[in-house]
């Protein structure tokens, strides 16, 4: 019975790891390749920009604004990018306001008051601080154009209201910093004056205060709209199923909406009307751009896909109509989040501005009730250790302590089973020809000795959701991105960069990706091998072969996992070996580890010739 239990545990673990390998290895591998291609393309564009900063081309944005203010904005940019432009050339096409904060740098395009030029100062493409800063938003005339825009929709009575082609006028300060907001104005032919004050904090939140002043002779009705628009699907978006990348939003009572790029291609348009409380945007793994309307007022939210001359993905919202009588004014405030999805920053924004479920901008996954607390625990310990890798080691010890009663009961049951081995062998020999009686006798023995043959499964089953949760923390939280451990591990969220097949860098050649078996995966495999050798070798040859090969298979499969996860697994195995040794010793059971290791190198005696 014990051998069957071990066999089933082995098969279950093998299936689990095969599934994990399919999801976590193939996806991140493709993502890494595409990310490298994207970095190389950006570097090529930067070099081209340095050679030709005077290049320019007209790429006007001409959305079709609806006549009915109750309608969501139309398709928007319908013109193709035209001749390829460098980023510098695209930015030089329009007058701009500089953005300079501790976290951001870039500019606001005065044509449309569009936020389409934004870099994240604190984050780089690679672990090197000398590598390029992360480019979040880009002008629409570029192939990967990505921007945020706020405007108005009106009718004949309102005249031309601010839209994507409106050129705003700057009043006073022309540099946006946390201490210096900027003011933009626009007056149309109906004597409607629009005054926009844009402010920004030290992190990633822009506040846009719009005032509409009616100096005309008739009452007007108009609505405020906002849109987050991205041209072309990012290369990394379909790399993995582990997290959501694409259009996202919270739509009041309808809750979180996650729309993959492929899904919106099929549906074209997904709308939510009369929403109170929520937000819309587009999210990547670590970064996002979102629009946040007043949380106590109705709005219409929409996710769209347009083809036209090039694919365009859009999350937008439309406010309820605003009525402005002659001589009166109306105000509306919207916010724009554009930056890194730092957990505490997102949580603080949700609390400060009462943004409905803004924390769901971070994809915590199915085990969010484990993943989120685990992140906060790791982050809290990090404040004392100053190293996320050490924090993971400490959390592993705490988890071992938390599940000690379960593990203790399991190991005690396993120890008693070892003590019962002589009786179990006797039963097998006695009923060798009658499997039914053999099983009945075994069950009676288990019941009499209070042994649970499946007790060893529980520590494994408990570890599975913890494994997934820790993987999710390492994979989606930006705090773990480029977080170093010690020595050669400079990014806990990336695989171990070394490989035994080039002697860990001593031999001057690049190893194929599937042979990148680093130091930590090897350490993990050794600890797994030792843990399995704590128990006697199964008498069945098939089971014995599986137990022998499992550590090797796990070593290859986990080599592509984040280094932080492999370190956790190796450390967890080490603690399990220590824990099991102590419990077995207390139960008076012989520890088989050294005998089993010696048995591997002991020559089997040859059968005597008859």
Swiss-Prot record:
GO biological process, one term: protein transport
GO molecular function, one term: membrane insertase activity
Stretches that traverse the bilayer: 7-27, 358-378, 387-407, 458-478, 510-530, 546-566
Keywords for this protein: Cell inner membrane, Cell membrane, Chaperone, Membrane, Protein transport, Transmembrane, Transmembrane helix, Transport
Low complexity bias locations: 44-55
Membrane topology reported for the UniProt record: Multi-pass membrane protein
UniProt-listed InterPro entries: Membr_insert_YidC, Membr_insert_YidC_N, YidC/ALB3/OXA1/COX18, YidC/Oxa/ALB_C, YidC_ALB_C, YidC_periplasmic_sf
CDD domains: 5TM_YidC_Alb3, EcYidC-like_peri
Localization: Cell inner membrane
Keyword Protein transport: yes
Superkingdom of the organism of origin: Bacteria
NADP keyword on record: no
Protein's job: Required for the insertion and/or proper folding and/or complex formation of integral membrane proteins into the membrane. Involved in integration of membrane proteins that insert both dependently and independently of the Sec translocase complex, as well as at least some lipoproteins. Aids folding of multispanning membrane proteins.
Family membership noted in the UniProt record: Belongs to the OXA1/ALB3/YidC family. Type 1 subfamily.
Assembly behavior: Interacts with the Sec translocase complex via SecD. Specifically interacts with transmembrane segments of nascent integral membrane proteins during membrane integration.
Protein name as it appears in the record: Membrane protein insertase YidC
Taxonomic lineage: Bacteria, Pseudomonadati, Pseudomonadota, Alphaproteobacteria, Hyphomicrobiales
Gene this protein is translated from: yidC
């Amino acid at each position: 019975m014990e051998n069957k239990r071990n066999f089933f545990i082995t098969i279950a673990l093998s299936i689990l790891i095969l599934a994990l390998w399919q999801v976590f290895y193939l996806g991140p591998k493709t993502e890494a390749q595409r990310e490298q291609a994207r970095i190389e393309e950006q570097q090529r564009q930067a070099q081209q920009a340095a050679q030709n900063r005077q290049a320019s081309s007209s790429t006007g944005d001409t959305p079709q604004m609806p006549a009915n203010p109750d309608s969501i904005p139309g398709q928007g940019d319908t013109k193709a990018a035209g001749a390829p432009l460098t980023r510098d050339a695209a930015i030089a096409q329009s007058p701009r306001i500089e953005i300079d904060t501790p976290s951001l740098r870039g500019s606001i395009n005065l044509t449309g008051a569009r936020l389409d030029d934004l870099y994240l100062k604190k984050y780089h493409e690679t672990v090197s601080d000398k590598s390029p800063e992360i480019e979040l938003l880009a002008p629409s005339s570029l192939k990967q154009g990505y921007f945020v825009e706020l405007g108005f929709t009106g009718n004949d009575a309102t005249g031309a209201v601010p839209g994507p082609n409106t050129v705003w006028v700057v009043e006073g300060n022309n540099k946006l910093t946390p201490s210096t907001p900027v003011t933009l104005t626009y007056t149309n032919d109906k004597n409607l004056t629009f005054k926009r004050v844009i402010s920004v904090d030290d992190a990633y939140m822009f506040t846009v205060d719009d005032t509409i002043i009616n100096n005309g002779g008739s009452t007007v009705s108009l609505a405020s709209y906002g849109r987050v628009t991205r041209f072309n699907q990012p290369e990394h978006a379909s790399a993995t199923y582990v997290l959501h990348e694409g259009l996202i939003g919270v739509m009041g009572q309808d809750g979180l909406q996650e729309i993959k790029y492929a899904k919106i291609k099929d549906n074209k348009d997904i709308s939510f009307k009369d929403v109170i409380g929520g937000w819309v945007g587009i999210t990547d793994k670590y970064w996002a751009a979102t629009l946040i309307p007043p949380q106590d007022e109705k709005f219409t939210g929409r996710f769209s896909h347009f083809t036209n001359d090039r694919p365009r993905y859009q999350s937008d919202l439309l406010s309820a109509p605003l009525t402005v009588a002659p001589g009166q004014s109306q105000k509306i405030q919207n916010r724009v989040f554009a930056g890194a999805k730092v957990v505490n920053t997102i949580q603080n924004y949700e609390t400060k501005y009462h943004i409905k479920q803004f924390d769901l901008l971070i994809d915590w996954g199915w085990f969010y009730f484990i993943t989120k607390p685990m992140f906060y625990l790791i982050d809290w310990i990090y404040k004392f250790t100053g190293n996320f890798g050490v924090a993971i080691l400490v959390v592993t010890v705490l988890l071992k302590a938390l599940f000690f009663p379960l593990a203790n009961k399991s190991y005690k049951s396993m120890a008693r089973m070892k003590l019962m081995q002589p009786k179990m062998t006797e039963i097998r020999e006695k009923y060798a020809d009658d499997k039914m009686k053999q099983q009945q006798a075994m069950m009676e023995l288990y019941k009499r000795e209070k042994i649970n043959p499946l007790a060893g499964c529980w520590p494994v089953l408990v570890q599975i959701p913890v494994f997934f949760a820790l993987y999710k923390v390492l994979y989606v939280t930006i705090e773990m991105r480029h977080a170093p451990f010690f020595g050669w591990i400079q990014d806990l969220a990336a695989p171990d960069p070394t490989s035994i097949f080039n002697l860990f860098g001593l031999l001057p050649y690049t190893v194929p990706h599937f042979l990148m078996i680093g130091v930590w995966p090897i350490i993990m495999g050794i600890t797994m091998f030792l843990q399995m050798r704590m128990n006697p070798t199964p008498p069945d040859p098939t089971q014995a072969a599986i137990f022998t090969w499992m550590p090797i298979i796990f070593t290859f499969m986990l080599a592509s996992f984040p280094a932080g996860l492999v370190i956790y697994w190796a450390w967890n195995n080490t603690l399990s070996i220590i824990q099991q040794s102590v419990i077995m010793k207390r139960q008076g059971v012989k520890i088989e580890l050294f005998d089993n290791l010696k048995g591997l190198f002991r020559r089997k005696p040859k059968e005597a010739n008859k």
